[in-house]
Amino acid sequence: MDAAGESEEPVSGEALSIAHALSHPPESYGNDPDIEMAWAIRAMQHAEVYYKLISSVDPQFLKLTKVDDQIYSEFREIFETLRVDVLDPEELKSESAKEKWRPFCLKFEGIVEDYNYGTLLRLDCSQGYTEENTIFAPRIQFFAIEIARNREGYNKAVSVSIQDKEGEEGAGNKEEAAEKGADSGGEKEEGANREGEK
């Protein structure tokens, strides 16, 4: 038991250390690989939870923050022509785009918790989180784009796609079960008919 207790202590100490490190603003750190990894893990966990959420319900009715209406109206006021179904990274990361995004993001400082935390954002909303389909963005940028995708119906493709896959898998299993049941049930049924006829 002592050996197990010793191995658990560094893990819990490490977890506390990571939690403590993540509580500081990212600007206060250099390029510490451990910190970068902790941020990447947290961003990936957020992405996984969000993708499961939009896969399991109709995203059009999701509420991501208490101020979704404000985020959406201000986003569409400033970025009225921005395509949100398939994003162009230049419209998020170029110098001219950053000049336009910066004031928008700063409007939500103190309103949206962790508004500037790094978050993974899908470029093509009809696809999942893959290395090729993901860009790192501030959380408020993620919220603005994903709220627009949800309200404008673009994320529905994800839930429909997942439900179609589940339906195909379920139908395949039902057909297989029906074939097995028909084989065994058919023999029993024939036997019952013979007995009933005799």
UniProtKB/Swiss-Prot annotation:
InterPro entries attached to this UniProt entry: PBDC1-like_dom_sf, PBDC1_metazoa/fungi, Polysacc_synth_dom
Phosphoprotein in keyword set: yes
Keyword Phosphoprotein set for record: yes
Alphabetized Pfam families for the sequence: PBDC1
Region of interest: Disordered: 163-198
Biased composition (Basic and acidic residues): 171-198
Record key words, sorted: Phosphoprotein
PTM annotation (Phosphoserine): residues: S126, S184
Disulfide bonding pattern of the chain: none
Family the entry assigns: Belongs to the PBDC1 family.
Protein name: Protein PBDC1
